[in-house]
């Protein structure tokens, strides 16, 4: 009797996971990060320029979403763009997970390929549902690895095309996290030096060059002096003033603080495993060490069961180390698995150099490393292979369950899941469900913006302070601030920015309670001081709304004027 092909069943399981995520994407309304990532493309749509008009360091990946936003705006405006972006990312992640799954099926059993693809699909940095640069960085990094693997296994024209597409994915990943370019250049240079990989590397280089050419010709401003001045301002961003090395060291210190005991347990497991291999029969010599690792992983997963989405990957990475070392000693190294782990390390380091969020930064590269670890342990065929495969499968399944559970139950920048009972019906967040309080605040702000749009021309620039990125999506007014991210009235960057840019005709000072959530009580805390605040007090007229104080410049252009 012919044995059934289980690959389609596991592909169906990935599809079911994606459907659950698609439904979960209806819940929660993030007032800050999620809409902030969309405003980069919105500024391009308004005719503003990268670097010259936007002074935030993570702006470059906006060119990836800009064509999609342009089409969406032409068809629907910005109504419901939050939900559209979320579902679009879930769809893209599902497609990428299937591609990863069928790629890994060439190396390991379908069960392990499913676990690896599920680990990717269940991850989202910060549980942010839209296409953040974190999530896109992970997606393009994994796609480049899959294309390279399929390219090495293929031949003829298809091989070159896959490596060319691999290069395009690497270029997109660099747009998401520019520091990743350091590792791409290093690895590509090494591949070009080896005769065996030179041709493939040249194809990949072609893809990178095409991506770079499109970015330079279509999106980078031609004002070199302005670009250099803008880069100086970007590098002096007050939220990123520590520098890349200090961010990396801070991330390492945070990991040591959080996972010191786990690291000690992993070392103990390695020592027990080594002793078992020396003094016990080979068939079950690895069992005591793996048992210690399994107990340590279980305790740690329980400890961090409600932590940041992705923290469970630390346990997988740490407690797989004894098994990986054993594979190394036995000479059972799988090159694709090793390269995936190296890619994960490079992605984690690039992210740590870019971000000041400490231990969270490494979680972007950890899924790739974890997939490489599971791929290695699940492919061992010697005496210890059965024990290692069982250990890797159980641990990967546990991490998958914890991560997927966090993805479903945790809510970023909104109330608990059971309080998201109000469905928004208008504006950029239409279709999302949020708390009754946030729904009321959202309605007040939309009414305020409608009133302003009825009175003032869309040529006027607007500035929301301290933070309301979705306001720039809801209003027809272009952004009049250095960035849509947290910018207080006292920010010293405002004075520098308005030396070369138009001062906003409309300034919206939000009430401090606007957008507050259990994990961020002071979202719109402000500081009423500095030259810009004094300018508002002296020369702008004031309009009071329930949600904000609005200041109108005497130079504001009336609608129809």
Summary of predicted features, one role per range:
Residues 38-42, 53-77, 87, 173:
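Short hydrophobic/aromatic helix or loop-helix immediately within or flanking a transmembrane segment
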Residues 56, 178, 406-487, 503-515, ...:
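Short periplasmic/luminal acceptor-recognition loop of GT-C membrane glycosyltransferases, typified by
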Residues 95-122:
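Transmembrane-helix signature of polytopic, membrane-embedded enzymes
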Residues 125, 147, 160-178, 184-189, ...:
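Membrane-interface alpha helices of multi-pass inner-membrane proteins
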Residues 128-137:
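Short acidic/glycine- and proline-prone juxtamembrane loop motifs at membrane-interface regions
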Residues 136-155, 162-170, 317-323, 369-372:
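Specific aromatic-rich, kink-prone transmembrane helix
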Residues 147-172, 198-206, 291, 335-345:
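Short hydrophobic alpha-helices at membrane interfaces in multi-pass membrane enzymes
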Residues 153, 182-216, 277-280, 379-383:
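Perimembrane helix-loop-helix junctions
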């Amino acid at each position: 009797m012919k044995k059934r092909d289980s690959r389609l069943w596991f592909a169906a399981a990935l599809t079911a996971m994606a459907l659950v995520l698609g439904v979960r994407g209806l819940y929660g309304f993030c007032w800050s990060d999620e809409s902030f990532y969309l405003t980069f493309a919105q500024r391009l749509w308004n005719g503003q320029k990268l670097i010259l008009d936007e002074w935030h360091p993570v702006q470059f990946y906006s060119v990836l979403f800009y064509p999609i936003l342009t089409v969406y705006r032409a068809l629907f405006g910005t109504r419901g763009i939050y939900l559209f972006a979320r579902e679009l990312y879930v769809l893209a992640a599902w497609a990428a997970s299937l591609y990863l799954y069928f790629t890994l099926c060439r190396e390991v059993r379908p069960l392990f390929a499913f676990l690896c693809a599920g680990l990717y699909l269940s991850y989202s940095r910060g549980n942010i549902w839209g296409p953040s640069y974190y999530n896109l960085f992970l997606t393009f990094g994994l796609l480049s690895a899959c294309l390279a693997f399929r390219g090495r296994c293929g031949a003829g024209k298809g091989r070159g095309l896959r490596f060319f597409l691999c290069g395009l994915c690497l270029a997109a990943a660099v747009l998401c996290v520019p520091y990743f370019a350091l590792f791409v250049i290093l690895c590509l240079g090494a591949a070009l030096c080896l005769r065996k990989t030179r041709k493939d590397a040249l194809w990949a280089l072609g893809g990178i060059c095409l991506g770079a050419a499109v970015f330079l010709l279509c999106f980078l401003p031609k004002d070199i002096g302005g670009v250099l001045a803008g880069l100086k301002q970007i590098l002096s961003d007050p939220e990123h003033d520590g520098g890349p090395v200090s961010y990396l060291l801070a991330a390492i210190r945070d990991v040591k603080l959080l996972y010191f005991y786990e690291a000690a347990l992993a070392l103990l497991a390695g020592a027990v495993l080594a002793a078992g291999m020396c003094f016990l029969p080979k068939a079950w010599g690895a069992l005591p060490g793996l048992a210690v690792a399994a107990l340590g992983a279980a305790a740690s997963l329980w400890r961090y069961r409600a932590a940041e989405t992705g923290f469970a990957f630390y346990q997988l990475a740490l407690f797989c180390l004894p098994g990986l070392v054993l594979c190394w000693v036995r000479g059972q190294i799988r090159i694709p698995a090793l390269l995936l782990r190296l890619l994960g390390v490079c992605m984690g380091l690039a992210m740590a150099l870019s971000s000041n969020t400490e231990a969270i930064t490494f979680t972007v590269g950890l899924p790739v490393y974890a997939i490489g670890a599971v791929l290695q342990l699940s492919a061992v065929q010697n005496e210890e292979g059965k024990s290692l495969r069982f250990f890797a499968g159980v641990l990967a399944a546990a991490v998958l369950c914890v991560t997927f559970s966090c993805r479903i139950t945790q809510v970023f920048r909104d109330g608990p899941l059971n309080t998201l009972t109000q469905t928004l019906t208008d504006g950029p967040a239409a279709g999302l469900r949020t708390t009754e309080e946030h729904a009321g605040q959202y309605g007040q702000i939309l009414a305020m913006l409608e009133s302003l749009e009825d009175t003032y021309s869309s040529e006027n620039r607007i500035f929301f302070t301290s933070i309301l990125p979705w306001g720039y999506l809801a209003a027809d007014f272009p952004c009049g601030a250095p960035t849509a991210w947290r910018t207080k009235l006292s920010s010293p960057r405002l004075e520098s920015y308005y030396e070369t840019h138009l001062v906003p005709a409309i300034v919206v000072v939000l009430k401090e309670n606007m957008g507050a959530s259990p994990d961020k009580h002071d979202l719109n805390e402000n500081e009423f001081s500095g030259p810009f605040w004094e300018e508002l007090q002296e020369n702008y007229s004031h309009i009071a709304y329930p949600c904000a104080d609005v200041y109108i410049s005497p130079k504001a252009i009336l609608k129809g004027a």
